UniProtKB/Swiss-Prot annotation:
Gene: Rasl10b
Chemical reaction(s) catalysed: GTP + H2O = GDP + phosphate + H(+)
Annotated segments matching region Small GTPase-like: 1-203
E.C. numbers: 3.6.5.2
Membrane topology: Lipid-anchor
Protein name: Ras-like protein family member 10B
Residues annotated for GTP binding in this entry: 11-18, 59-62, 128-131
InterPro entries assigned to the protein according to its UniProt record, in alphabetical order: P-loop_NTPase (IPR027417), Ras-like_GTPase_Reg (IPR052661), Small_GTP-bd (IPR005225), Small_GTPase (IPR001806)
MF annotations from Gene Ontology: G protein activity; GTP binding
Keyword GTP-binding: yes
Summary of subunit composition and partner proteins: Interacts with CADPS.
Residues where Cysteine methyl ester is found: C200
Length: 203
């Protein structure tokens, strides 16, 4: 049986969210930053641990605020489909404090607009541009502790440029969505050693 998951990728301008998606899908990276101005949809099929998953990856341009209801969601073409996804990937640049503040704001708005009684939608926070480690503005431990312990979200650092931890990110994404859909499976994420335990490939 093939599972279909819709995933929204959000982040401030220039954080490399589109670069992450393209590195995952096409194994390519461009040094030229082309701002995302419209919503982009990618439809890859992914095999993980022998199971096929159809992904609908929605790459959104930066939004000023998360839509509070369906009416607001469909009034803005850039936000359509944002409230009905199975998981959110929120990307920030580890060298840009403002981009982390953006992620913090969007995450809070997602929680505030969530329909009461619905199942919790997984959120994974992603720190991109790990290859620019020397320019980091917030210590990794501080961010990791806040995201995992306080926010109860998954956390991954990656480098879209060097394809570092990109596969790990989407492997954990599939695991988190699967956990959210199966109540008998413990939903806590375990990122260390994930690639040794799971096999993930794109068709």
């Amino acid at each position: 049986m093939v599972s279909t998951y819709r995933v929204a990728v959000l982040g401030a301008r220039g954080v490399g969210k589109s670069a992450i998606v393209r590195q995952f899908l096409y194994n390519e990276f461009s040094e030229v930053c082309v701002p995302t101005t419209t919503r982009r949809l990618y439809l890859p099929a992914v095999v993980m641990n022998g199971h096929v998953h159809d992904l609908q990856i929605l790459d959104f341009p930066p939004i000023s605020a998360f839509p509070v209801n369906t009416l607001q969601e469909w009034a803005d073409a850039c936000c359509r489909g944002l409230r009905s996804v199975h998981a959110y990937i929120l990307v920030y640049d580890i060298c840009c404090f403002d981009s982390f503040e953006y992620v913090k704001t969007i995450r809070q708005q997602i929680l505030e607009t969530r329909v009461i009684g619905t199942s919790e939608t997984p959120i994974i926070i992603v720190g991109n541009k790990r290859d620019l480690q020397r320019g980091r503005v917030i210590p990794r431990w501080n961010v990791s502790h806040l995201v995992r312990k306080t926010w109860k979200c998954g956390y991954v650092e990656c480098s879209a440029k060097y394809n570092w931890h990109i596969l790990l990110l989407f492997s954990e994404l599939l695991k988190s969505v699967g956990c959210a859909r199966c109540k008998h499976v413990h939903a806590a994420l375990r990122f260390q050693g994930a690639l040794r335990r799971n096999r993930c490939a794109i068709m």
